[in-house]
Amino acid sequence: MLDIIFKNGKPIEAVPGGSSFNAVISLGRAGVNASFISEAGNDRIGEYVIQFLRDNGVNADNVSIFPESKSPLSLAFLDENNNADYIFYKDHPHDQLEFATPEINPGDIVLFGSFFALNPVVRPQVAGFLEYFNLILASMSASFFFASSA
């Protein structure tokens, strides 16, 4: 997702964002082995977000590109206290998240954003992924995988 931030009615910044995205970027910058699972449109925004992940040390190999989709946008309107009021735009002609399951090793950690926890449309994919993950969960080495709708 690309966040376009407005202050006093004018755009002041455009940055990739989202809660899971921000967390995985922090891990990548800290040198932690981290991957991001998501979707993007085949557009300049999608290219920018994927490159931003890579530039910050995050594996973006599991970001699925959909030629018939546009990458999601968020408009954040800041008030005088810098609290944001958001408007979200998403244009996916398909209803379900599609992704190739990445290699998961014993001890890896998976974090899902709230979209995956609440959206019944993608729940079957999340349940299947968690079943796969639970089959191999065992030791203490750690990598991080994030799934998001960004």
Identify the residue ranges that each predicted region occupies.
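A glycine-rich helix N-cap at a beta->alpha junction
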Residues: Q51-S69, F77-D79
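Short coil/turn connectors at secondary-structure junctions
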Residues: G31-N33, S71, N82-A84, P106-G107
